[in-house]
Amino acid sequence: MLMLITYDISFDDPNGQARLRRIAKHCLDYGVRAQYSVFECDVTPDQWVVLKNNLLETYDPMCDSLRFYHLGSKWRNKVEHHGAKPSVDIFKDVLVI
């Protein structure tokens, strides 16, 4: 299933940048960066549980925000891409890690 993950991490405290890096790393473990704070992750239900738990353990609910969008398996009908950055089809395009 395709998950769209967005986040906003506060830099008002000294740990903000470290949280930002950890959140991005967790997302990169399962997907690709679509924009600075937006990731597209193709995960199984079990992987989603692990990823979501990692993200919820990392962010600070008092000053950060996370959003999870369940796009499911028929996501191609729900996503349109326009603009300069090329779109990555995580099911078709080759990713080199």
Spans of features found by a protein language model:
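Intrinsically disordered, low-complexity boundary segments flanking structured domains
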Residues: 25-27, 52-57, 80-84
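Extended, hydrophobic alpha-helical segments
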Residues: 1-34, 38, 42, 46-47
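C-terminal structural segments of small proteins and small subunits
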Residues: 61-97
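Short acidic, gly/pro-rich beta-turn/loop elements at beta-sheet edges
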Residues: 15, 51, 78
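Short, intrinsically disordered low-complexity segments
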Residues: 35-72
